């Protein structure tokens, strides 16, 4: 009986260790912004509401010295010419 209790306790203990490791792994697996000085980009149209006669679209960003990689920037565009909507208007 003591052996069965010991086996059950050890199985529970190991499962708790695995749970804690998983939580720590998820906690430290946060992707940091490689360029924190730049404005944050929208990577999806799923949560974006655009005004009438506009559509949400994702355009590739230009490659610059500050951002030497291709990225996507999603936002509202005029539906007839795909020009970005001015933020202040």
Swiss-Prot record:
It is found in: Secreted. Keywords: Disulfide bond, Secreted, Signal, Toxin. Contains 3 disulfide bonds. One of its GO terms (molecular function) is toxin activity. Residues 1-22 form the signal peptide. Transmembrane segments: none annotated. The keyword Disulfide bond applies. One of its GO terms (cellular component) is extracellular region. Its main location: secreted. Expressed by the venom gland. It comes from the Eukaryota. Belongs to the scoloptoxin-12 family. This is U-scoloptoxin(12)-Er1a. It comes from Ethmostigmus rubripes (Giant centipede).
